[in-house]
Amino acid sequence: MKRIVIFVLLSLIFLLPGPLGASPWQELSSPYFTMRYQEPERKMALFLLQRAEEVRGSIIQDAGRAPPAPTLIYLAPTWEQFQEVQPQGQPPTWAVGTAYPEHNLIILKSPRAVKKGRSEVEEVLRHEYAHLVLARALKGHEAPQWLDEGFAMLQSRGWSISWTYVLSRGVLSKALIPLTELSDGFPLDQYQAQLAYAQSFSFVSYIKNEYGAEALARLIKGIAYGLDAEEALRQATGLGLGNLERGWKAELKKRYSWFPIATSFFSLWFLASLLFLLGYWLKRRKAKRTLREWEQEEALQEPPFPPGSFDDEDRE
């Protein structure tokens, strides 16, 4: 009996999660996803797992194929753990999520690590899952980076005024990156990378809006069948990359070139100062006019000679 008790105790010890203070990965599962997280992140993990199931269908719809189930998702609570679970290489320091189609794997930074809320992390999840979906739809063929990232941003629905500012600044300063340079990779510089992401989203959206959702689907299918991006674009839209890029840039100039002027801090400060000075000038002008009117009214009411102009002798 004593040996049985000792055996049970030893078994329980081996089942314990390690030294005090260690945080082993916990796991949650749903029909299409497995979420690994650390205990303080349980509520966030449950939320993201539910949202992943809900948005899966809409993302697959645009690409046509889904990754095999289950897709593994890591929710890393710190930058160090975010790095540790990467299967290859190290992500840029500004990265908040990574996707590895060959591993059917997504790695996310927890909101605790990036000081963001649920909605932002959900956007990152959608973005990274879109990478897996597109890779599956392409059947092992490589998409140009602008298509890969543009499709993912389109699915994440994370476009905001800050992205609009990045893109419009690129338009105004004539610093847009040629799309041919965004085919094989993105710049490592953070601002240039942001511009590359913004351009990719904008260009893929332009294709979808100008030529229809079916054109985007034809582009993806063309690459999946082995066509290069140039030929796939021609079959999807009737135009090659150069002509499409010119039409897209013309649209950008009409849409975004005014934005930095209207929204920059300096412009807003200058406009506020100008309005303040204009208000001050109008107020002074009104005050001077009022003062003149008072002086005119007083002049009409004054006697012809001021009191005390004559003494008593003069009156006699």
Regions found by a protein language model. Give the residues of each.
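Juxtacatalytic substrate-recognition/specificity segment
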Residues: 22-144, 196, 229
